[in-house]
Amino acid sequence: MEELEGHRGEGRLPPPPPLLPFPKVSVQVYTVPSSSTAASAAAAGGARQAVAPATRDGGDGGGRAAGVLDDPVKARIVSHPRYHRLLAAFLDCHKVGCPAEAAEEIAAAARVREARQRAAAAASRMPPAPEDPELDQFMEDYCKLLVECKEELSRPLQEAEEFLRTVESELNSINSGPPLTALISESKAGLDSSDDDEHEDGSGMEMMEAAEDEDLGIIDPRSDDKALKRHLLRKYSGYLGGLRKELSKKRKKGKLPKEARQKLLTWWELHYRWPNPSEMEKIALAESTGLEQKQINNCFINQRKRHWKPTEEMEFAVMEAYHHQSTDAAAAFYVDVDARLVGATAAAPASAVYTARPDHGVWRA
């Protein structure tokens, strides 16, 4: 800048007034047009002096505007067709990261300053400036520089906003999906399953089925990538359907209909002393409840483990009955073997020999 002032030969210019009082805002110009003439150098120096004051609206704005226009180079910059674009690009750099109210104040102050400068230029009745290709090129380059500066300042903020929107969309998709209890396999089976759990699981399945019918899945309506989510849903809908069926099967294993469970409870209360149904009783219970015998077996096994403990008398009676049953079965076996041996000996030829062993049954030699 000192070299530019030396070319002008008019002494040192007063420092430009400060910018608007917003913290951490500083814009400096590091490039000037490549020209060896004093006129182009003066135009570069005048551009810096004319742009910065345009962002401050003090009480003596009219006097400052008139002071700017006292210099013909500054007046030419203010009256240049690209001055409005230059000022807008400069203000855009200041608006990056500012609140909406602060950005509006900056724009309002700039409009007032620009209006005063143009009014002063019109009142001065200066002759139309001749064409200056170097000044035109400088204004164009300076506008491009400010636009690039604004893009560099805005890029981190845009990336941060995009990241926040992505995280918000993922959180909303998680919250709008089925409850977590619908994805956890039931640890308890049989009669201990509560009606509340059934209601929660049913609601989760209804939500998933409705999402598949609408071909939208659990999509956040506020997200910007709806098309991508629809594409992914169409691509992986088969896997999601298979997973839903697997989860449904796992839940059905541990649940019994309310009416069937009540009938089993009634039978349990009537046979509490020995709640072990026979095969005939299991068949009858299966017909009355509509359940499979395997479900009935599991139900009573779990119920006995959790809610029933035989007394000492019952254990003794069970062991005694088992002992008598085993003895009767062995006696019937030997009687049957003897009867068959007697009949076979009368009808068989002399060469046929039958032997009976208690541990191996009947053998023929």
Curated annotation (Swiss-Prot):
The keyword DNA-binding applies. Residues 1-20 are annotated as: Disordered. GO terms for cellular component: nucleus. Residues 1-11 have a biased composition (Basic and acidic residues). Signal peptide: none annotated. Keywords: DNA-binding, Homeobox, Nucleus. Disulfide bonds: none annotated. Residues 227-247 form the ELK domain. Pfam families: ELK, Homeobox_KN, KNOX1, KNOX2. It is found in: Nucleus. InterPro entries: ELK_dom, HD, Homeodomain-like_sf, KN_HD, KNOX1, KNOX2, TALE_homeobox. One of its GO terms (biological process) is regulation of DNA-templated transcription. One of its GO terms (molecular function) is DNA binding. It comes from the Eukaryota. Belongs to the TALE/KNOX homeobox family. PANTHER family: HOMEOBOX PROTEIN TRANSCRIPTION FACTORS. Probable transcription factor that may be involved in shoot formation during embryogenesis. This is Homeobox protein knotted-1-like 7. The gene is OSH3.
